[in-house]
Amino acid sequence: MPKETPSKAAADALSDLEIKDSKSNLNKELETLREENRVKSDMLKEKLSKDAENHKAYLKSHQVHRHKLKEMEKEEPLLNEDKERTVLFPIKYHEIWQAYKRAEASFWTAEEIDLSKDIHDWNNRMNENERFFISRVLAFFAASDGIVNENLVENFSTEVQIPEAKSFYGFQIMIENIHSETYSLLIDTYIKDPKESEFLFNAIHTIPEIGEKAEWALRWIQDADALFGERLVAFASIEGVFFSGSFASIFWLKKRGMMPGLTFSNELICRDEGLHTDFACLLFAHLKNKPDPAIVEKIVTEAVEIEQRYFLDALPVALLGMNADLMNQYVEFVADRLLVAFGNKKYYKVENPFDFMENISLAGKTNFFEKRVSDYQKAGVMSKSTKQEAGAFTFNEDF
C-alpha cells in the first residue's frame, strides 16, 4: 500500500475542514432562516386569521344565492349517479372523454428524466441565489402536489359521478403521483444536506409564504359549504395561477441553456397541469347552475394577489435576473385567460410579457418537446380514439 505523503495528508485534512466548515455554515444559515420564518409565521398567523374572517363575511353576503345553488346541486347531472349506466360505453360526454384520452396519450414516468447533466450545472453554473430560488420553487411544487392529490382522492373523484370524468380524475391522481415523485427526486438530487432536504420537504410548515398558499387553497376546496363550481375554480387557480410563476421561472433557466433535466421535467409537468386546468374549466362549462361570476372573479384575483406577493417578498425573481413587474404581468395574463374560460370578462387586460412562454400559454400548442417526436404522445392513442368516436372504418378491425 503506497505511503501517504505529508502534502496529501495536509490536502485531505484541508478538504475535510472545508466540508465541515461548509456544513457548519449551512446549518447556521438554516437556523437563521428558521428563526426569520418563525417571526414571519407569527405575523402570518394573524393575517390568515383576518383573511379567514373576511372570507366568511364575504360568503355570508352571498348566502341566499349560494344556498339556492347548493340545493340545486342535487340535480346536477355531473354529480348525480345514473343507475342505468353500468358500463363506460357508449360514451355520453364526448368532450370530457376526449380530455381523458389527451391525458392518457401524455403519460410519462420519472425514470425518463435524465438528471446527470444537472449536477454539473447546479454545482458550477448556478450561483447561490439561483440555487436558493430553484430549491424553494421545488419545495412549493412538492407541497402543492400533496394538497392537489388529497383533494382529488377525497373530494372530486368521489363527488363526480359520470364515468368519463371519473376516468380523467383516476388518471390525474396517477400522474400527480408521478409529479410528486419527480419533485422528490429533484430535491434529493440537488440538495445533499439532510437538514436542508427536511426543511424543503416540510415547506408548508417551514416556509410561511408556502403555508399561506396552502391555507388559501384549503379554505376554498375543503369548505363543506362551498359549491362544487367554486371549488373547481379554486382548484384551477391552484394549478393555473399558483403554478404559473414557478413554471415561468424554470423556463427562464431553459432559455439560458441550464439544467436540462429540471427544465424537461418542467415542460412535461407544465403540459400536464395545463390539461388539468382545462379539464376543470370543461367541467365548469357542463354545470347547469354556475356560481356567481363575482365569486369566480374573487377566487381568481385572490390567487393572483398571493402569487404576486410570493414572488415579491418570499422569492424575488430578481434572484434569477428576471423582471418582477413582468412576472406580475404574466401572472395577471394567465389569470385573465382563466377568467375567460370560466365565462367571466378579463379583469387585468394585459398581454403576455414573456415571449418564451407564448407557445406554452396557448391551449393546444405544445411545440417544446424536443426529446420526442409528435407531442410526446403514446403512439396512436388519440387517433384511434377519434376514429372510433367518428365511426371511421379502419383496416385493423376484427371481422
UniProtKB/Swiss-Prot annotation:
Its main location: nucleus. Fe cation 2 binds at E176, E239, E273, H276. Its cofactor is Fe cation. Fe cation 1 binds at D145, E176, H179. Optimum temperature is 30 degrees Celsius. It is an enzyme of class 1 (oxidoreductase). GO terms for cellular component: cytoplasm; nucleus; ribonucleoside-diphosphate reductase complex. It catalyses: a 2'-deoxyribonucleoside 5'-diphosphate + [thioredoxin]-disulfide + H2O = a ribonucleoside 5'-diphosphate + [thioredoxin]-dithiol. InterPro entries: Ferritin-like_SF, RNR-like, RNR_small, RNR_small_AS, RNR_small_fam. It comes from the Eukaryota. It is found in: Nucleus. Binds 2 iron ions per subunit. Keywords: Deoxyribonucleotide synthesis, Iron, Metal-binding, Nucleus, Oxidoreductase, Phosphoprotein. Pfam families: Ribonuc_red_sm. The active site is at Y183. Induction: Induced by DNA-damage. The keyword Nucleus applies. One of its GO terms (molecular function) is zinc ion binding. Its EC number is 1.17.4.1. GO terms for biological process: deoxyribonucleotide biosynthetic process. The modification Phosphoserine is found at S15, S24, S41. Heterotetramer of two large (R1) and two small (R2) subunits. S.cerevisiae has two different R1 subunits (RNR1 and RNR3) and two different R2 subunits (RNR2 and RNR4). The functional form of the small subunits is a RNR2-RNR4 heterodimer, where RNR2 provides the iron-radical center and RNR4 is required for proper folding of RNR2 and assembly with the large subunits. Under normal growth conditions, the active form of the large subunits is a homodimer of the constitutively expressed RNR1. Present with 538 molecules/cell in log phase SD medium. Provides the precursors necessary for DNA synthesis. Catalyzes the biosynthesis of deoxyribonucleotides from the corresponding ribonucleotides. RNR2 provides the diiron-tyrosyl radical center. Belongs to the ribonucleoside diphosphate reductase small chain family. This is Ribonucleoside-diphosphate reductase small chain 1. It comes from Saccharomyces cerevisiae (strain ATCC 204508 / S288c). The gene is RNR2.
